[in-house]
Curated annotation (Swiss-Prot):
Matches recorded under InterPro entries: CGI121/TPRKB (IPR013926), CGI121/TPRKB_sf (IPR036504)
Protein's cellular compartments: Nucleus; Chromosome, Telomere
Protein name, as recorded: EKC/KEOPS complex subunit CGI121
One Gene Ontology cellular component annotation held by this UniProt entry: nucleus
GO BP terms in the entry: tRNA threonylcarbamoyladenosine modification
Family classification: Belongs to the CGI121/TPRKB family.
Function: Component of the EKC/KEOPS complex that is required for the formation of a threonylcarbamoyl group on adenosine at position 37 (t(6)A37) in tRNAs that read codons beginning with adenine. The complex is probably involved in the transfer of the threonylcarbamoyl moiety of threonylcarbamoyl-AMP (TC-AMP) to the N6 group of A37. CGI121 acts as an allosteric effector that regulates the t(6)A activity of the complex. The EKC/KEOPS complex also promotes both telomere uncapping and telomere elongation. The complex is required for efficient recruitment of transcriptional coactivators.
Subunit structure: Component of the EKC/KEOPS complex composed of at least BUD32, CGI121, GON7, KAE1 and PCC1; the whole complex dimerizes.
Principal place of residence: nucleus
Domain of life: Eukaryota
Keyword Nucleus set for record: yes
Length: 233
């Protein structure tokens, strides 16, 4: 079984969000192929972990060249998940499924294909975030999304543990682990945040490379990114 952390979002307590984190993933091509084949058993948002920052959760108590993930922080991921669920519940979704909607909402542009290239699993992904939303369509046209009671922490844990060839990483209550492999430069590029050169010396090195400096940089980026995602919605 895989470690799965279940988060509850404000106002949408009926829709628990199940999240798993893996490192040293050895079968990304297989997982991606199942998504492309629309295998219902693999209905997840499989995200390359290089695009999330490690900041913790305050308000709810294409892989990088060096194989580092693109979710900036747990707040980055879960805020986007909140917007995704809200879009589905208010019939404002732009894509066909809850999980494709989540990937779409993470991206700053309106191209779903580009969203998957930037945030989705690729053939070279080694650090993986899997998100499972407990939603099912009431009809073929997906006019209404209902809670799927068969999706539980245990069911997600069992399935992911059997299909993902990698090391399951336990996620704490605050979810800081979700951003531990983020690629800051990749995230800056995707969200067009500049290169952060104001904080670097002549050789491109950070003037202050300590943890507080890095966390402060991530926090500033997070504010801009969340604003971008909110405006898109």
């Amino acid at each position: 079984m895989a470690h799965v952390r279940t988060f509850t979002l404000p106002h949408y307590e009926a829709y628990p969000v199940h999240v798993a984190l893996f490192k040293d993933v050895k079968n990304p091509s297989y997982l991606k192929s199942q998504l492309l084949e629309a295998n219902p058993a693999f209905d997840y948002a499989f995200l390359d972990a290089a695009m999330v920052a490690r900041l913790g959760i305050a308000w709810w108590s294409h892989a990088a060249a060096n194989d580092r993930p693109q979710i900036l922080s747990p707040t980055h991921l879960l805020s986007t998940t909140f917007i995704t669920i809200h879009a589905l519940c208010t019939h404002r979704q732009k894509t066909r499924t809850p999980h494709s909607e989540l990937v779409f909402r993470l991206s700053p542009n309106n191209n779903i294909g580009e969203s998957y290239k930037k945030f989705g699993i690729s053939d070279t992904t080694t650090h993986l975030i899997a998100v499972k939303l407990p939603l099912k369509s009431s009809d073929a046209e997906a006019k209404e999304w209902l809670v799927d009671g068969e999706i539980t922490n245990e069911s997600v844990s069992q399935h992911l543990g059997s299909v993902v060839e990698g090391t399951s990483v336990e996620i704490s209550e605050k979810g800081e682990e979700l951003g531990q492999w983020c690629d800051i430069d990749k995230i800056r590029k995707v969200y067009k945040l500049g290169d952060g050169s104001a904080k670097k010396g002549k050789k491109g090195a950070a003037v202050n490379g300590d943890g507080a400096e890095k966390e402060g940089e991530k926090k500033q980026m997070e504010v801009v990114i969340l604003g971008t995602i909110a405006l898109k919605s």
